[in-house]
Design a protein with these regions (language model features):
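N-terminal pre-Walker A segment at the start of P-loop NTPase domains
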Residues: 1-8, 52, 62-63, 72-74
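Conserved P-loop NTPase motor cores
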Residues: 4-7, 16-39, 50-54, 102-218
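Conserved NTP-binding/hydrolysis module of P-loop NTPases
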Residues: 58-99
Length: 218
């Protein structure tokens, strides 16, 4: 599948998505979500969970780069957005530097093009002109966000910011030239609906893929 700038294997969902994995404890939802995230080829995962750091194997398999343990922190969603926005800023920085670098090299190899002295200083190091670098080689990073063990937390009971994130997840980290980085959200929950402290209707309505195991409900 191809969605925007992202490709996923034929048997995998398209990016970006909101995935709900629903099943009681020990049902296999963690294994299913881990396998799906690995299959889809994300560059790294942002984990939102008070228990994630205790599972090193999980952290290694999911290439977890950031962990938010305090699921009652009102600035949690803002922190996630900043990570993605910083990726957008860094990609724009790289693309701008690469454009200037190419112009500089053309000017150096030309007899008539003017040379920008600022760029001459910026790119010269170690007796050579160094090409700009970017962590993801000039492409948009593929980012997954995994929510686990958040039942009853302020993140779920005061969901205004989380609702907004689930609604515009594809548009987080907007780029000046158009498009955005975007993120895929994965929620691991024990019940699709619950009396209090679970995922609300707004997020459930944003669901694009559902992994459903046997639950306690008939």
């Amino acid at each position: 599948h191809t969605s925007g700038d992202y490709e996923t294997p034929p048997m995998a969902p398209k990016m970006h998505q909101v995935c709900l994995a629903v099943g009681k404890r020990q049902s296999g939802k963690s294994t299913a979500v881990i396998n799906l995230i690995e299959l889809m080829g994300f560059d790294y995962t942002i984990a939102v969970s008070p228990t994630m750091k205790s599972n090193k194997e999980l952290m290694d398999r999911l290439k977890i780069k950031h962990v938010f343990e305090n699921v009652d922190d009102p600035s949690l969603v803002d922190g996630i957005k900043k990570i993605v926005e910083d990726e957008a800023t860094d990609l724009e920085r790289y693309r701008d530097e690469l454009r200037r670098y190419r112009q500089l090299i053309r000017a150096i190899n030309s007899d008539h093009l003017p040379i920008d002295e600022g760029d001459l200083v910026s790119f010269y190091a170690d007796r050579d002109f160094l090409k700009p670098k970017h962590t993801w080689d000039g492409r948009k990073p593929k980012i997954a966000i995994l929510f686990d063990d958040c039942l009853g937390s302020d993140l779920y009971t005061k969901p205004r910011k989380l609702n907004a994130l689930s609604t515009y997840s594809r548009h987080v980290g907007q780029l000046k030239e158009g498009g955005s980085i975007g993120v895929s959200l994965f929620f691991m929950i024990q019940a699709f609906k619950c009396q209090a402290g679970g995922l609300n209707k707004v997020i459930r309505n944003q669901c694009t893929s559902l992994i459903l195991f046997k639950t306690k409900d008939n």
